[in-house]
């Protein structure tokens, strides 16, 4: 299954707020159904499926990508669900988004693909690059790069930067000071339902 490229409003109406996909918020379709048909039962499969779709849509992943991360998380020591979230949060495209250098994760992915971003002085054009503590994230020297990201910061850096990241607005430089903790993740998600959804596939 490929990455969704349709109307974003349609997704958030069905799944709820997805800050990585869009800053827009709407009343979710699920809430409307719950109130109008209180006796209608929703299957456990559908609940797990929608939670998985929420994770995919927020981080902008294809099904095969999310399944790959799920397999890595299952092999690691610790809580599979929390490790999965940590892997997704430490992606470069998401880190750019959380630093406020882009209003959305798709926007951050475009910055990386167009070679506007460097890690430790080396240009990185892979959105899935795994950021680690000690990484320094800078903007390319091109005037266009600095203009785009400065504009984004002035317009969209309104959310609190999570504690595992630091941003120097004078140098337009971000840094990763530690791995992200569960409480700093800005998506409302029940990761255990996602783990249960994939339990027979990994």
Curated annotation (Swiss-Prot):
Any one annotated GO CC term: chloroplast
Entries under SUPFAM superfamilies matching the protein: Alpha-L RNA-binding motif
Compartments in which it is found: Plastid, Chloroplast
One GO BP annotation of this record: translation
Tagged with keyword Transit peptide: no
S4 RNA-binding domain mapped to chain residues: 90-151
Gene Ontology molecular functions: rRNA binding; structural constituent of ribosome
Coiled-coil region(s): none
Alphabetical list of Pfam families matching this protein: Ribosomal_S4, S4
Assembly description: Part of the 30S ribosomal subunit. Contacts protein S5. The interaction surface between S4 and S5 is involved in control of translational fidelity.
Function: One of the primary rRNA binding proteins, it binds directly to 16S rRNA where it nucleates assembly of the body of the 30S subunit. With S5 and S12 plays an important role in translational accuracy.
UniProt cross-references to PANTHER family, sorted A to Z: 30S 40S RIBOSOMAL PROTEIN, SMALL RIBOSOMAL SUBUNIT PROTEIN US4M
Family per record: Belongs to the universal ribosomal protein uS4 family.
Protein name: Small ribosomal subunit protein uS4c
Species this protein is from: Plagiochila adianthoides
Gene (UniProt): rps4
